[in-house]
Amino acid sequence: MANTLAQLKSLTTIVADTGDIEAIKRYQPQDATTNPSLILKASQIPEYAPYIDQAIAWAKTQSNDVAQQIEDAGDKLAVTIGVEILKYVPGRMSTEVDARLSFDKQKSIDKAHKLIKLYQEAGIDKSRILIKLASTWEGICAAKELEQEGINCNLTLLFSFAQARACAEAGVYLVSPFVGRILDWYKKDTGQDYTAETDPGVISVTEIYNYYKQHGHNTVVMGASFRNTGEIIELAGCDRLTIGPALLEELANSDQLVVQKLKPALTQTAAPAPMSEAEFRWDFNEDAMAVDKLAEGIRNFAIDQGKLEVMLKAKLA
């Protein structure tokens, strides 16, 4: 019998959630995703030193201002790692906009344009890139404009149904609802443990998937942020699942039977009228878990972006 990972690949598009090129070569995913934390982690791999040197050398040619050089080097490093990863995945690379821009629609759009330009200068067409944005109201509005320009987006840090609905209504290409971080919050809040079937993160992704399929939304659902293989197996059939190297290895070494859990609705019904900003903000605010986890996620990505920039600044000196 095929291993668990191979069985999953027959039901769901598997994406590698890593900046580690060796892991991508090993597990042969369709797509790859990174974020500021993963770029920081990747930058500490000795083999990546040339990419950092290349990014810094390039940044020095773009500006004499140190702050601008640091920003440019960070963008160039993320894109350079993305370009390398795209040599080993047939599909798309998700590269994230600076989390510190999560509440600024125009600056998010500007950063997306810059990242796409850097990819194009490296010979990568925008059709192979997904721009990752936090699922704030501003991020969703930025994505709506980018999608209308033909730049596809991946809306991340998604913890609530309100965020998922707003993303679909904005015509976003793909959403990344977080599973494990939802589980973390509920375990801490309630003090209880959950099975894969009762996992609040699994239930959230299932609800989003069913809503999208029922109402004919084309937005791709990509479950993310997993704590264990049970969560992953319980979402077999989801459009895509993005999985870190440790769990990919565990799945590859398992022979557990995989059964399709998520299936598209046989009949579709008309979607409700799009949410207003006020409706979105109210519905989102009603979900204490989502409010906590979105804020925490943005803060933590910003912290890791800052750590990366400290490292780049030291090398620029």
Curated annotation (Swiss-Prot):
The lineage of its organism: Bacteria, Pseudomonadati, Pseudomonadota, Gammaproteobacteria, Alteromonadales. One of its GO terms (cellular component) is cytosol. Keywords: Cytoplasm, Pentose shunt, Schiff base, Transferase. The keyword Oxidoreductase does not apply. This is Transaldolase. Pathway: Carbohydrate degradation; pentose phosphate pathway; D-glyceraldehyde 3-phosphate and beta-D-fructose 6-phosphate from D-ribose 5-phosphate and D-xylulose 5-phosphate (non-oxidative stage): step 2/3. Belongs to the transaldolase family. Type 1 subfamily. SUPFAM superfamilies: Aldolase. Its EC number is 2.2.1.2. Its main location: cytoplasm. It is found in: Cytoplasm. The gene is tal. Transaldolase is important for the balance of metabolites in the pentose-phosphate pathway. It holds the Pfam family TAL_FSA. Homodimer. It comes from Shewanella denitrificans (strain OS217 / ATCC BAA-1090 / DSM 15013). GO terms for molecular function: transaldolase activity. The keyword Zinc-finger does not apply. Disulfide bonds: none annotated. One of its GO terms (biological process) is pentose-phosphate shunt. The active site is at residue 132. It catalyses: D-sedoheptulose 7-phosphate + D-glyceraldehyde 3-phosphate = D-erythrose 4-phosphate + beta-D-fructose 6-phosphate.
